Design a protein with these regions (language model features):
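Divalent metal-coordination and catalytic microenvironments
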Residues: 4, 84, 127, 159, ...
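Flexible loop/turn segments at secondary-structure boundaries
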Residues: 8-14, 99-100, 130-134, 167-170, ...
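C-terminal cap of metal-dependent C-N hydrolases
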Residues: 38, 114-121, 127, 189-234
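Acidic, glycine-enriched loop/beta-strand segments at the rims
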Residues: 77, 102-113, 155-160, 168-205
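Hydrophobic alpha-helix feature that most strongly marks membrane-spanning transmembrane helices
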Residues: 81, 97, 121, 145-152, ...
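Feature captures the catalytic cores and cofactor-binding loops of soluble hydro-lyases/lyases
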Residues: 131-133, 143-150, 162, 192-202, ...
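Short, solvent-exposed cationic patches
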Residues: 236-243
Length: 243
């Protein structure tokens, strides 16, 4: 058994996925909007939303991160007030009529996060898409800054293993994950005490600092903490023959 994990307590997903029933969004956001036009169907959808809001931590902690115009950066409770409404269920419906908001919902807890982080079968990941959650730009820096250096949950050696070779071995990524002759040369040079995760839920794409020199497929992509403009990344496919 294997798993991967990012080091944040909030999930990130579309409002339609988080706060409407699966049957209502079957076929995508356009199909959902068509169903909402029918009063009987709309009433059925709204009847299921309160429990979904509760399961995501409540309107006061559901954070709108992207794709919602002036509502970006607000909680669902704040957006409800801005819309002149009192019920967050009605706010969900109003927002989904014209937008496709993306949410951060705080559904995890630190104890569980740390418990799984210690497991040898759990690897590092971001699970991130651009501009919606700090995990995309901050996961590895957050692991080093908080869980290696501050809280001592992981040793630096364990962090490196779960972020490199273990991933390459699990996914059969030939020539990756290890520094050795004939490999692709993906190398990150840093001092752990300098690494900072700068991304936040309000500013999810603030880049980490402290990864002073980064080599991607043999080309220098970051030098002295500055991007060089190199475009040396490539699609990585499963391979079983080691390079």
């Amino acid at each position: 058994m294997t798993a991967d994990q990012y080091p944040y307590l909030a999930s990130g997903l579309a409002m339609s996925s988080a706060l409407t029933p699966a049957w209502a969004r079957d076929g995508g956001i356009k199909a959902l909007r068509e169903r909402m036009k029918d009063p009987v169907t709309l009433a059925k959808i709204k009847a299921e939303i309160p429990d979904m809001i509760y399961e995501r931590g409540g309107a006061e902690t559901i954070f709108i991160s992207k794709r919602a115009g002036d509502f970006n950066g607000m909680t669902l409770a704040e957006a409800t007030g801005k819309l002149g409404l009192t019920d967050p269920v009605d706010a969900v419906i109003e927002l989904l009529k014209t937008m496709s908001p993306y949410l951060n919902t705080f559904v995890a807890n630190e104890e569980d996060l740390v418990n799984y982080m210690k497991r040898l079968w759990v690897m590092s990941c971001t699970d991130g898409s651009v501009g919606t959650h700090p995990r995309a730009a901050g996961s590895y820096a957050e692991l080093i800054q908080t869980y290696v250096m501050q809280k001592k949950v992981l040793t630096l050696e364990r962090f490196v293993r779960r972020s490199t070779g273990q991933v390459a071995d699990t996914y059969h990524l030939a020539g990756r994950g290890y520094i050795k002759a004939g490999g692709y040369a993906d190398i990150n040079i840093f001092k752990p005490e300098e690494v900072r995760a700068n991304a936040s839920y309000a500013n999810p794409m603030l880049l980490a600092t402290g990864f002073r020199n980064v080599i991607v497929n043999g080309q220098i992509a970051v030098e002295n903490d500055q991007y060089t403009g190199a475009l040396s990344g490539m699609v990585i496919r499963r391979e079983t023959n080691k390079k």
